[in-house]
């Protein structure tokens, strides 16, 4: 699905598709023995539905913290193989300078990769697509932008980067790749 080696900005629509995809990335990382740090909201029901089958030894590698409590030079960030920021910015308007600065600090402090998720904006030009908050700034910081959107059919989703498109199908609370 999402490249396992690059930091990404995941732009998603309303609903829980973005959360589900991030949790699947977390599950894959935990099962491979990685240390994961989730910054932001992590509802227990969503986490249980995806991570409920992961054994305690692997789950012990998952830490959850808040945006307000994280310090960019923390040991947790330095030892994390994967950092999920859910969400990295507010869900309306432009991302604030403090949010961009916090993301930059986290990118500079972690040796692992970062997935910064945010709700997309509707394209004001009437094109019908989604736009990403502060896209050019985040790409300058090294994040690749991926858009997760629904297809017309109920179970299908499209995960799209500048050079790849992956068709996903949502079944039994998880995404599986249909075509790349």
Which positions does each model-derived feature cover?
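The Walker A/P-loop phosphate-binding site
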Residues: 1-55
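Conserved inter-motif catalytic segment of the P-loop NTP-binding fold
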Residues: 34-98
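P-loop NTPase motor core
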Residues: 77-141
């Amino acid at each position: 699905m999402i490249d396992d080696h690059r930091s990404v900005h995941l732009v998603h629509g309303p609903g829980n598709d973005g959360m589900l995809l991030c949790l699947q990335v977390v599950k894959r990382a935990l099962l491979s023995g990685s240390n994961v740090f989730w910054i932001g909201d992590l509802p227990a029901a969503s986490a249980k539905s995806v991570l409920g089958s992961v054994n305690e030894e692997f789950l012990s590698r998952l830490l959850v913290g808040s945006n307000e409590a994280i310090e960019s030079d923390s040991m947790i960030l330095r030892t994390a193989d994967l950092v999920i920021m859910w969400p990295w910015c507010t869900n309306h308007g432009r991302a604030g300078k403090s949010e961009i600065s916090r993301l930059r600090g986290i990118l500079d402090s972690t040796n692992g990769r970062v997935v910064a998720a945010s709700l997309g904006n509707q394209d004001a030009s009437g094109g019908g697509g989604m736009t990403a908050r502060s896209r050019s700034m985040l790409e300058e910081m090294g994040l690749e932008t991926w858009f997760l959107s629904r297809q017309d059919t109920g179970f299908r989703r499209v995960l799209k980067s500048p050079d790849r498109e992956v068709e996903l199908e949502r079944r039994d609370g998880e995404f599986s790749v249909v075509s790349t």
